[in-house]
Amino acid sequence: MKTYTSVIFWMRSIACLSIVIIHSITTTFSKMHDVPHSTSLRLFQLLLMFSTPMFVFISEFLLAKNYGSKIKKGFFKNKLIYLGIPYVIINLSISYFYFRPKNLHEYLFHVGDTMFHGGAVTYFIVIIFQFYLLHWLFSKYLIGLNPIKMIVISILITTMYWAMRTFISPPNNPILAAIWDREGWMIFIGWLSYFLLGFYIGTYYEAFMNKIKDYTWHIIIGAFLSIIFMFLNYILGISTWVESKRVDTPIYVTMVILLFFLFSSYICLLYTSDAADE
């Protein structure tokens, strides 16, 4: 049964605003060449890079919280209508209005690029569809496993995936080399930790919220250290891409998500106390 979770509303809203800010700064840098590329602005953008991964988390959290290990009848048909059709229409439009092809051949090239090669910002819809399938196939098995161990393992896998793309040169094989290109953005392995975090928090939401305040300082310190780690990677030139596909993003996004729920738990406690006083 669907239930309203206020923290998800705020997570979604802040993630949307963050994406707008990220692209506004990037567009300013790319279109106005006389604007200096400020390091402080780039670091500010990095702080907002939780946005796209958070949508993966939110999708799986809501699915796990509302339906558990099962999926309601007509689920995939519904998603194909409300996500699949817009995905096609938006990519067809981007291929024409943004790339401005000179002929049909160019247009079809851009359509193929945006649809199947991650050539447009809509690529995250493909990622979310992959996780819908994974939830359908594996959720009943995931419930029987240790959540903390699975989340830690998934963070390591996701981190190693982005580290591979960052620090290892692509192979000569053109099919494998595609993983190092934009196609690699669309593979679920690079987003696995957000999926499992969403699944387990959604599945055990009540128990999670009852316990989260016990780990207040762990979460705050962990978030602070993850920011320092991310900033150092950028400043020292270890990873200078300003995007969510970074080696330090999985742990950073995890801590940001936990901060949202931690803050929500204290807000709920405050409202409960006020109601009791009345």
Regions found by a protein language model. Give the residues of each.
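Aromatic-anchored segments of alpha-helical transmembrane domains
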Residues: I21, L92, I155-F167, G222-I235
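Functionally critical transmembrane alpha-helices in membrane proteins and complexes, commonly lining
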Residues: S6-K65, L83-N91
